[in-house]
UniProtKB/Swiss-Prot annotation:
Keywords: Lectin. Coiled coil: none annotated. Lectin that binds beta-galactoside and a wide array of complex carbohydrates. This is Galectin b. The keyword Zinc-finger does not apply. Residues 1-138 form the Galectin domain. GO terms for molecular function: carbohydrate binding. The keyword Transmembrane does not apply. It comes from the Eukaryota. InterPro entries: ConA-like_dom_sf, Galectin_CRD. SUPFAM superfamilies: Concanavalin A-like lectins/glucanases (SSF49899). Pfam families: Gal-bind_lectin.
Length: 144
């Protein structure tokens, strides 16, 4: 699922979804040239952690894809596991994205590509059992 849009500093993207029982889901903010300005990938018992050789467990992987190549991943470990419904918000600040999960600040992510080049927001359940309930843009960023 996706929405086509323009996005800039001071705006937020909200995605509400039922978390997968296993696997991964991602929310991507993509520029018109295919650059992935922001990739946030929730992994619940998925794939392989090269450090441990075991699956990733309850982690957010945050990254960007510039010129066809992924950058260095940033990770948020131990994402809450008792929650079934996730309300995820990412807001464009002056120099970075602020990321919230269920109204709790979980990370900031410095821009690696201009945020005003965004033309699409995508939600991908990667073939697992996550269910998207809402995907929208909020103008302007909600006040806390």
């Amino acid at each position: 699922d996706h929405i086509d849009l323009e996005f800039d500093v001071g705006q937020c993207i909200q995605a509400s979804y039922t978390a997968p029982t296993t696997g991964r889901t991602s929310v991507n903010i993509v520029a018109s040239d295919g650059t992935v300005v922001l990739h946030v990938d929730y992994r619940k018992h998925w794939g392989g952690n090269p450090s441990t050789g075991k699956p990733w467990q309850n982690i957010l992987i945050i990254n960007s894809k510039l010129g066809g190549s992924w950058g260095t991943e940033e990770k948020v470990h131990d994402v809450e596991t008792t929650i079934v419904n996730y309300d995820y918000t990412q807001c464009g600040q002056d120099a970075d994205f602020s990321l919230e999960l269920n109204q709790k600040d979980i990370a900031t992510y410095a821009y690696r590509s201009p945020v005003n080049t965004v033309s699409r927001v995508q939600f991908d359940d990667q073939g697992y059992d996550a269910v998207l309930r809402k995907l929208c843009v909020v103008y302007p960023a909600p006040s806390k």
